[in-house]
Every structure is written in C-alpha cells, then in structure tokens.
Swiss-Prot record:
Pfam families: Ni_insertion. This is Pyridinium-3,5-bisthiocarboxylic acid mononucleotide nickel insertion protein. GO terms for biological process: protein maturation. Involved in the biosynthesis of a nickel-pincer cofactor ((SCS)Ni(II) pincer complex). Binds Ni(2+), and functions in nickel delivery to pyridinium-3,5-bisthiocarboxylic acid mononucleotide (P2TMN), to form the mature cofactor. Is thus probably required for the activation of nickel-pincer cofactor-dependent enzymes. GO terms for molecular function: lyase activity; nickel cation binding. Keywords: Lyase, Nickel. InterPro entries: Ni_insertion. Belongs to the LarC family. The gene is larC. Its EC number is 4.99.1.12. Coiled coil: none annotated.
C-alpha cells in the first residue's frame, strides 16, 4: 500500500510549515539533522519544538541565522524577498552543486533540485530573464536552502508516493520586499500556481500566506488533483506558522488510505506530465551552419530548462551546399523573449523566424504499474474513448540493464501489463 499524503493548506503554506508538518508526521529528526549537516552550510542553526496556535498543539521548525533571535520567514519569507541582512547571492548552478555534494539520498537530491527549479523558473518569468541569469538572493539564502532540502529529506524519509494538495488559501493586500511593494499573491507565487495546476483561494487575511518556497514545494510534490471519494486517515501531522492570525496558523498533513478497491498503482513523486489543452503556441526557427555540436547541445539544454515545450534540430543544406542545422523551438507566447535571448546568446545566428501555430494535444498522465520486472512508469493518453499506453523509455532501459534482456522483449512485456485505471 502506497503512502498517500494530503496537505490541507487552509492557512497557506511556507517552507518551514511544510517541514514542521512532515516532522510531526514522524519524519526522523536525526536523519534530517545529519542530512542538513552534510550541506556544509554555515551561519545558521535549527530549532524544533512545539507551540500552540489558537489552542491547537503543533510542531515548529525554525531556521535561526547568525545575529537573529528568530527566523520569521513564514508568510513574510526572507525566502524569496529578502528584507536585508545575509545578502547571499547564488545562482541555480551554485545551489545544485551544494545539493550534489551533500550526503542526502538521491531521491532527496532530485526532489530538492526540482523544487528549486520551480522557484527559479517563476522568478525568471517574473523578471523576464533566463533561469541561469537569476542570482538568487531569494532561494540562494541559507534559510531557504535549508527549508527546501529539509522538506525533500522528510518526504523521502516518510516514503511518500502520492501527494494531493488542497486549494492554497492566500491572503490579500501588499507585502514589502527587496524589489519594492508587491501585491499578494506575489508574482513568483502567481507564476507557480499558473504553471503547475495549483488552485488559489484569496481570503480576507491581510498579508502573504503562501510563500514562493511553499508554493514550489506543493507544485513539485503534487501527483494527483483530487482526494479519493472515501478514505481513512492513518496519521496526522500539524505544522505551525510563525505569525499569530485570527485563525489557527497551521498546515495539516495527513497520511491517508484509499478505501476503494482499485488495482495497485502509484504516481511517482519525482515527476508527472502536465495536461496540455488545445490552443496556441509559437515556433521559433533559425538556420545555423557555423556552430559546434557542443554549443548546439548546450543551447538545447538551456531552452528546455527555461520552459521550451520542445526543441529539435533538423539537418539541412544552406547556400554553397554547406551542411547545417535548423533549430526549431516550440514555446508559449510568454516564453518567446526568453527563448530568443538564449538562442542569440549561445549560438552564432543573427536572425530568428517566428510564427504562431495552433495545435491539438491529447491529455495524458504518467502512472506506475506493477510488472514481472518491477514497477514501470507508463504514459496514458485518451482519444475518442480509446486509451493508449506508452512505457517510459528510461524505465525500460533500466530493466534491460538490470536483467540483460533485449529492449523490445521488455517493452512488449510491459505493454501487455495494462492494469492501470
């Protein structure tokens, strides 16, 4: 039976609240401390304890920086909008290096970097720049690194397989940050909600209830849109916020059990494919005959990291019969400028063609099925009451490497095991 987590965000969500709730669910404190120590970060300490919010007993997780009595990043997170002090500037590569050099589990590393990427993408979109151009005084601060890695470590320790998220209850008004006075929800939160299928619900509470770090955690770990029609509660964890609100400032986390008799299936926490509706997209094209394969590969990576829906090269012949490549990028209207910036910066081209297209895309999801070789992720698409199944290449490759069997044999065997849904 998989561990299914439900986060009830009726007072919003922030990084420290998420960690607190997971610790209260039973995540191992010693494992967490050892994992954080392996990050080799200095200038902070963590405090874990209990406090009451509107009479409700809750766990708290505070990151205290040198020279600070308390760490008040909940709902006014230093997190993503520093108010001064400890001005650490790191880019996404620096943060990935810290994570990769740590001793946390591979699953925790993957999830930590996924959460950071969600924040980075949202901030890049807000500022109109590429992800690798953002210098994260926001998520690069020690307290935010600790919050995000701690959340990933706790989720891994609890062996969470499926995650459902309630509506994110957000405050209203404005909040002061390094960039000035911003409306609530702040741009990064709005971008995360829009890009990741989260639901926002505005309340009368003044100020910020949903922080970018909290929203990014929710976006990165969510695997299902709805709760089961009937479920049992196996365990409850309650995480405390810092601010005192008219209502209980808590985040409740439930380990639940689906009471319906379904075939066993899980959705991987690490990733899932978002459904794409019919609509418009943009195609950017340019012909390149004087670039190295390394630079073209690097450009493709940058484009995909910064939100391109698809990137591909086509071999062509240009004037004077010179062999060349046509670079094609498919993206949303909002990402056109970012894509152009990356192409001009990393290739030798001096011009880009672009045009708007319409497309029809089948809705799909990734689920996990049990096979004779173990669990395999399968992409499931539907069209005119027909369901199509496509085993994930990386899982087939892994099984082939583990068993020594041929690719087609494993692929065919997985295709026969259509026990999803």
């Amino acid at each position: 039976m998989s561990n299914q987590l439900y986060l009830e965000c009726y007072s919003g969500i922030s990084g420290d609240m998420a960690v607190s709730a997971l610790l209260d669910l039973g995540a191992d404190v010693d494992v967490l401390k050892k994992s954080l120590h392996s990050l080799n970060l200095e200038g902070y300490e963590i405090n874990i304890g209990r406090r009451q919010k509107c009479g409700i007993d809750a766990c708290y997780f505070d990151v205290v920086l040198e020279g600070e009595a308390n760490h008040h990043h909940d709902h006014q997170e230093k997190h993503d909008h520093h108010h001064g002090g400890h001005p650490v500037h790191r880019n996404i590569k620096d943060i990935y290096e810290i994570i990769d050099n740590s001793q946390i589990s591979d699953r925790s590393k993957i999830l930590s970097k996924k959460i950071f990427h969600v924040v980075a993408k949202a901030e890049a979109k807000a500022h109109g720049i590429a992800i690798d151009e953002v210098h994260f005084h926001e998520v690069g601060a020690v307290d935010s690194i600790v919050d995000i890695v701690a959340a990933a470590v706790c989720l891994d320790n609890l062996e969470i397989n499926e995650v459902m998220i309630s509506d994110l209850y957000e405050g209203s008004g404005h909040v002061k940050c390094q960039h000035g006075v911003l409306p609530v929800p702040v741009p990064a939160v709005a971008n995360i909600v829009m890009d990741n299928g989260l639901n926002l619900r505005i309340t009368d509470t003044r100020g910020e209830l949903v922080t970018p770090t909290g929203a990014a955690i929710a976006a990165a770990i969510k695997t299902k849109d709805t709760l089961p029609a009937s479920y049992g509660i196996k365990k409850i964890g309650i995480g405390s916020g810092t601010k005192d609100l008219p209502k209980a400032n808590i985040l409740r986390a439930y380990i639940i059990e689906d009471n319906r008799n379904y075939p066993k299936k899980t959705v991987a926490v690490e990733d899932h494919i978002d459904s794409l509706d019919d609509g418009e997209a943009w195609v950017l094209e340019t012909n390149i005959d004087d670039a190295t394969g390394e630079s073209l590969g690097f450009t493709m990576e940058r484009l995909l990291e910064n939100g391109a829906n698809d990137v591909f090269f086509s071999p062509i012949y240009m004037k004077k019969n010179r062999p060349a490549y046509k670079l094609s990028v498919i993206c949303t209207k909002e990402n056109v400028k970012i894509m152009e910036s990356i192409i001009f910066k990393n290739t030798t081209t001096i011009g880009i063609r672009k045009h708007k297209i319409r497309r029809t895309v089948l809705k799909r999801e990734v689920t996990t099925i049990d096979t004779k070789y173990g669990q395999v992720r399968v992409k499931v698409c539907e069209f005119e009451n027909e369901t199509y199944y496509y085993p994930e290449y990386e899982d087939i490759k892994r099984i082939c490497n583990e068993t020594g069997l041929g690719f087609q044999r494993v692929y065919d065997e997985v295709e026969k095991t259509k026990t999803v849904g």
